[in-house]
Amino acid sequence: MNNKTCPNIVRILAVLFAGIFITTSQARTWTSTDGKSMQAIFMGIEGENFRFKMRDGNEIVVPSDRFIKADQEAAERLDLIGDDSFTKASARQIDTLLAGNLKEAGFSSFNEPLPDDLFVRRVYLDIIGRIPTKEEFLAFAESARPDKREALIDDLLLSPGYASHMFNYFADMYRLNASDAFVNGIRMDPYVQWWRDQLKANRPYNEMVSDMLTATGNVGQNPASGFLLRDTGMEFDAFANFGQTMLGIDISCAQCHDHPFDEWTQGDFYDMAAFFGNTQRSLGYRPAAAMMGGGAIQMPNAPEGWKKQFEDYAVKEHGVVLRDQSDRQFNYFVQALGWNIADNETLETVLPHDFRGSGGKPNDVARPKTLIGNAAKVGGKTRREAVAEWLTDRENPRFALVIANRMWDRAFGRPLVGPVTDFADSSIRGAGQPEALQFVTKEMQRVNYDLREFMRILYNTRAYQSIATEEEPDWGSDYAFQGPVLRRMRAEQAWDSMMLLQHGKEIDEKTGADGSFYKAVLDVDFNTMTNEKVWEHFEAWKQASGRRMGNAVLASEGSMTPTVVSDNDLRASELAQPYTNASMLDTFGQSDRVITDDHNYDGSVPQVLALMNGDVTERLTGLSSKVVEDMEEYDGPDDKVRGVFFTLLNRFPTKDELSLGTGMIEDFGDDGISDLAWALMNSPEFLFIQ
């Protein structure tokens, strides 16, 4: 052990032990109306009483009216999201760890603290993906609550917008694509909706990943199967994406040869891919992976002969002409039923004919072997179940580190170690903030992969609540995290903010097509349903076949009748995934969901033109726009100017800005309001998160 390594190891060990000793000694202080105080962890509200856990582990119940107003307000908030004693203690620990390395990086401390106006705009954009309304901005600016920042963070994390904005991130990460471009008429809407539902329920991330890796059936029977069906026919590409998203390892190079810059060999690639070797991704009744040998089962997850029996029934009872153009919808329906995931032990991963790596020879059968860490326990379970258990096990810190690092990147605009899809162990050891990286990895495990609670910790740090660093850090050097990096809005944030300006905060509650009809039609139990019952599903399928299928939802629960929902006035997360080419979302960089994390933040001429004279900008700042109409509630020109600034930039205007804006309104009336709104929307300040 050299002298340089030893202090780092000592510091990292100190970090790990620091996480253990966060106890009630860091608990919130609660104050009674007569001035007495106590330290305790809040457990919940029971009628007119508050329940607490004391230092000795005992729990007590105290009437709520015994506490000062600020504590009563805090209790109401914590009852919804949980006590924040550990949250704040963890946030303080992160700040301490970061601060310890700031001086080494040449900084005396964090960037300047974020003022209230920049804070409120940042947390709205970062947590729920849109700017605040002027009413939301003023409510925060005028609040005298001592815990107003913590309260706002919690309120936003509990709002529908949190899941909406988080969905946009994972849609990019997991390349969520609902279109029928995969196979004739086959869609992924139930899988996309599954992601929305999991995030709304705040499902632990490790459980979601386990569901995706072990799912069987089609997307109607089990929507999580969409993860593996996403790359049907490109199984090794699917495995490479698994490595990037869940392990932070890009091993795709090793499919053809030993990795030129890392330790992975061609044999490692196929050994790890072998965990998915028994996985049959099927189209109709044929395995999609031609490169994998073995026999096909006639209809995945169905009794022997089911497909032929149903087709014979359709021919005899309904005059269907199989594989004829006139009955193509019947063929599409059967194909969609059979587009599913099954475990087939006769399938194996075989080394390619030109295999040149060590550990085997061409056409050998690859045997499952993990890339890193402990071996997976294969006995008594499917290979996919084994790799899911290995991946999410607490003994595999890599999984926790990868998602913690990604969530950190969301908050700060830069990961602790990167890039997020591919970093070696040496990069972890050489990270600029190694103690913080180790600590947040442990925190992700401590909160049991509760992403909402993890983000709650990050948003409460002094580091996050600092002025953004304007100069983009060089990827070739370590960033010290003296504050978040100045970022441009994602395409979805810009879209949702503009929808807010046009329609108001009602957009937070509106939902679009949810895949419920498509899910119901394909949710066929081959073992129990009669041919007549399955035919009813096909009759329903025909009602919404073609382009209407993507917008079809169940008219009522329990029915098989479709109704079509409009995609007007919806947030980006509720639109078709991905949205149409040449739309504003596409113009501002929304991913086409082909490559992992392919969102584009670069500016472009079409973006400038869209903001300067596009149809959306006209609707937002024109004389009949909501922005101009809302200013009618203000009397004087100076109040109208403030109102426009509150609405678009969420801050008070400077003295010079107020004077200039007042002159515009005095000279041109509503045209002046419209021109001011147009100017603010086209300023860099509107699109950037400071």
Where are these regions (language model features)?
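An acidic intrinsically disordered interaction segment
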Residues: 86-88, 370-376, 562-580
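Metal- or metallocofactor-binding catalytic centers and their adjacent structured scaffolds
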Residues: 164
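Compositionally biased alpha-helical segments
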Residues: 25-96, 102
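Long, His/Glu/Asp-enriched segments that create or flank divalent metal/ion-associated functional microenvironments
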Residues: 499-575, 583-589, 594-605, 609-612
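Bacterial N-terminal signal peptides that target proteins for export
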Residues: 2-13
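Primarily short, surface-exposed interaction patches in extracytoplasmic proteins
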Residues: 92-122, 126, 130-161, 175-530, ...
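Bacterial N-terminal signal peptides
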Residues: 11-21
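Globin-like tetrapyrrole-binding proteins
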Residues: 170, 676
